[in-house]
């Protein structure tokens, strides 16, 4: 084997006769032998070099077979024009034949039988061309039908943008990974038979990112034209509709490259022309694109960030900087940059750190104009309290001296004075809330002046305002409102039947005091029926001027004239501290003759109306009940109780039978009965 290898290595040099043949074909005769030998050595070396480079390309492609494209790449590497026309989609299987002392490699072509071609049946006739209509959109929404493409979800957009090798087209999931060039030939030769080639011959599968061509349909082109014209046009109503469409439409994924290019080019042109209105419109387009939850903008941030940063730190954005409000555009663009950093900044791209360095560099420079200085401070302040604490607060003293030199010094330029005033207002606006959280109260102007220089007194006053505003907001958050809606409760006191007419005592309590419905029954021993006057009823109420709730005892005392005993039925309830007003209503009613015994009497109703105590408004918060244990040894257990009673008034008719009150707790009142009020 070693001898054969040495023999093959010795035969790799071309014979010198080949050089003579080539020279004769070119019209050069009588070439010397030494010249042919030198040419043979040089050509052999060049061929070996090209072959080695072609093998390198083959190994880099992870293939086991050398192709003509590898030879072409090797020739291009040597600055040699490659050979054209020797390309094939598949590997060409050359066959070897020898005879007559010669060796020949040839490509074996397939023999075709004409009878097979003639007898082959004709293919099916294709279908005729037809037109079919379907809805592109219904009231601005694309219907989910097979003819309409589904909108690409945000996850798929992110995967295509960040991991192109893992993303696949809709028809490639079933086919699996892309195949090498040799796999298709192996499958064709197998004719349906499953052949698994060795991995050394096939190579590892690889996937290339397909070239994405952003081709818009006619409808999308028309939509893009209308949207861009409306966003930068003069009609505010159309502009609002266009921005709303950009912020909510889920089918703008294919038009994102156009929109980002439109915004970046528009900012570049209008900054040179100092067109403030168009710059504002373009920034509103950026805001609408970022508000759309279905769009993934990370692939286009490299175009949007320079456009937004230009509107922040540009030296001049309008024709009249002393009159036009370009400060609002800088503030709006600074908020956009902060939103971009919040959504797209990662540890890989470091968007926020790079933007922070840009703002800091332009702010620290002594030659920076006041407009650029304002934009840099606004951009840093919108990035959060940590950036303010780290980068802005340490430079407040230097910036305050620069502002004071412009405001208090000789008037050099009105634009500089206006810019310094805006920078001072911006610093006070953003630094005061941070200082209110960092520094403990109280706030001393001398301490602020010593730490922050000329801005110290103004900062101190703004910090005091920030503390007061924060306390007011906390008080508003902690304030609670309790609304209780309950039906009006009714307390009915009834007694068992006794000799003589008896009437139940009815106590009405307002709906603001939640009293449970309770029924008290006082049983007495039976006595011979005899006419007797109506009993006297007393309601003992306790009132207190304090704000706390108390426990009140309602006692019903009934005394009969013919007996020496008194029955007391206490009812304990917890109500808020109120000052009651007792109203005595005397009512004369007529009962059916079959149920009422002979005799005359009157009904006395005590209506208790609770009012707030003296010094308490109507809108005060309700008091929480704090029950106090009552004493059962006295009808009036609480100090300061008021005994409310009334004189008996004779009625025109006997009272109704006991135990038959109205359903709503009221008794029928005659038209002629007096109603005195206490």
Swiss-Prot record:
Subcellular location: Nucleus
Molecular function GO terms recorded: aryl hydrocarbon receptor binding; DNA binding; protein heterodimerization activity; RNA polymerase II general transcription initiation factor activity
GO biological process: mRNA transcription by RNA polymerase II; negative regulation of cell cycle; positive regulation of DNA-templated transcription; positive regulation of transcription initiation by RNA polymerase II; regulation of DNA repair; regulation of transcription by RNA polymerase II; RNA polymerase II preinitiation complex assembly
Annotated disulfide bonds: none
Any one cellular-component term (Gene Ontology): MLL1 complex
Modification type Omega-N-methylarginine: residues: 524
Pro residues: bias regions: 622-632
Chief location category: nucleus
Cross-link Glycyl lysine isopeptide (Lys-Gly) (interchain with G-Cter in SUMO2) mapped to chain: 196
Gene3D superfamilies assigned to the protein according to its UniProt record, in alphabetical order: Histone, subunit A, TAF6, C-terminal HEAT repeat domain
Assembly and interaction partners: Component of the TFIID basal transcription factor complex, composed of TATA-box-binding protein TBP, and a number of TBP-associated factors (TAFs), including TAF1, TAF2, TAF3, TAF4, TAF5, TAF6, TAF7, TAF8, TAF9, TAF10, TAF11, TAF12 and TAF13. Interacts directly with TBP, TAF1/TAFII250, TAF9/TAFII31 and TAF12/TAFII20. The TAF6/TAFII70-TAF9/TAFII31 heterodimer forms an octamer complex with the TAF4B/TFII105-TAF12/TFIID20 heterodimer.
Family: Belongs to the TAF6 family.
Entry protein name: Transcription initiation factor TFIID subunit 6
Species of origin: Mus musculus
